[in-house]
């Protein structure tokens, strides 16, 4: 990004950049104000009543937060991308339809892409990546995702969320062949279901509330 500021050509108005930039900003604003903020009202009420939700309500709240978080975060990113483009600055894409992912690895290639690249480049690769055997690869993955959890917040639930994604990544690494042999629709259901459950721990204010919602989702 920095070299773009030094380019003299980027200091002049360019309608070919301004128009799509304005569209991207408007799209992001709609995602945030119209969609994310609408879900936020129901989600806030749902998590406040975590102990009393039935199965349908628990799933509605969990999926609602899953969508709220995506539209909120990607909305802000779209607005930033749009403003940058209006000033002839191209900002890297940060989200690429992450909930279409069929496995956890693909999810992290589509979700918060800049963070994933940073952690891969500066943590995973220096630790040895996948070059030192399966056991070391699994340890490296766990370290990366635990740090990802801490990056989002210095709380135990963020750490647990990172641990869950690390464990899912390790399991996918170990059982990749049989998993990839499943029907794509089943892969999507498993992956999306896991992501939704993990977001419950990310959003909940206490482990007790998170477990209550998940138990309701599982009809326990």
Give each language-model segment a name:
Residues 1-220:
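Membrane-embedded transmembrane alpha-helical bundles that form the catalytic cores
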């Amino acid at each position: 990004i920095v070299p773009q500021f030094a380019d003299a050509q980027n200091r002049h108005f360019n309608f070919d950049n301004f128009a799509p930039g304005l569209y991207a900003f408007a799209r992001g604003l709609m995602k945030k104000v119209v969609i994310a903020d609408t879900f936020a009202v129901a989600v806030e009420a749902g998590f406040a009543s975590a102990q009393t939700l039935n199965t349908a309500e628990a799933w509605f709240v969990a999926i609602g937060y899953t969508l709220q978080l995506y539209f909120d975060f990607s909305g802000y990113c779209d607005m930033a991308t749009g403003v940058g483009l209006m000033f002839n600055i191209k900002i890297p894409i940060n989200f690429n339809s992450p909930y279409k992912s069929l496995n956890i690895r693909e999810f992290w290639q589509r979700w918060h892409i800049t963070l994933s690249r940073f952690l891969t480049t500066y943590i995973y690769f220096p630790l040895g990546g996948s070059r030192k055997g399966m056991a070391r690869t699994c340890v490296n993955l766990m370290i990366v995702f635990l740090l990802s959890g801490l990056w989002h917040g210095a709380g135990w639930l963020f750490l647990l969320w990172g641990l869950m994604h690390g464990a899912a990544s390790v399991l996918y690494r170990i059982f990749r062949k049989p998993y990839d042999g499943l029907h794509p629709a089943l892969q999507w259901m498993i992956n999306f279901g896991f992501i939704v459950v993990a977001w419950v721990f990310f959003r909940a204010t206490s482990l007790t509330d998170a477990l209550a919602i998940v138990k309701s989702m599982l009809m326990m």
